[in-house]
């Protein structure tokens, strides 16, 4: 992660501001601006955690933040420990510790045994700019808290980012949800990720959502979720165009709108609108392009040279063919 200091801006700043609020500090509003109030909150966190209180989020502070961001810690059992006392020490619940450690026997803890201890805060934050890196961390955090969820990689984006899927349930009826086909619509990714967290927690607690018992749904159906189909485009919108992007010069040429990527870019990193790159009605959509002022790669509505020309749409199409959605 980048080093954050006074004057820094962007998604990483929002992330630490949101985290600091959740763990009892006051960084000011979650606005992505590293001002004096945020700096002071960072200093207080550093003092409380034995770090140099310089108000700079460098490698050591990021490392300490990382434990909270991924949502759990590992703990080595000592003589006299009980799961109840461990859960109280970490401000979490006994149920959360038991869920994260399937098969553990509370009455037969072994000295030296390493367990996973979830923190008492949610993994998925919904008040931040939701980049691929944040989603990747959240998936790992959710898998640690809820080992019964299934996580897989269906494919990779143009730039090699994983196209994750998460499976919830074991029933015969299969349902598929996906998000962030369009880069500007990145908010659908944290929506789905928060659903995953709530659904998994409901299963662990044997509770209901809107009157539906989650364990009953779990046994009746299987929900497959691909939360971010277009991670390259999402990061372009949220983090801006970086010099080391292999499409740097082409992206500048393709975005001929005069507006920043954060306001106009829906396509993948090769300027293809993924929603218009599927075989269904591809020819009809292609015929519309001239009237829309589209003559090649760009921010939106270019369907590519052929159906499924992009690795992201190939991944989604192949995934659906393997299931009975």
Regions found by a protein language model. Name each.
Residues 8-18, 31-36, 67-91, 113, ...:
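Primarily a LysM-type cell-wall glycan-binding module
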Residues 164-173, 180:
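Short beta-strand-to-loop junctions in surface cap/lid or active-site-entrance loops
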Residues 172, 186-325:
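Active-site/substrate-binding loop(s) of hydrolase catalytic cores
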Residues 3, 96, 118-159:
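Short glycine- and acidic-rich boundary segments immediately preceding or forming the N-terminal edge
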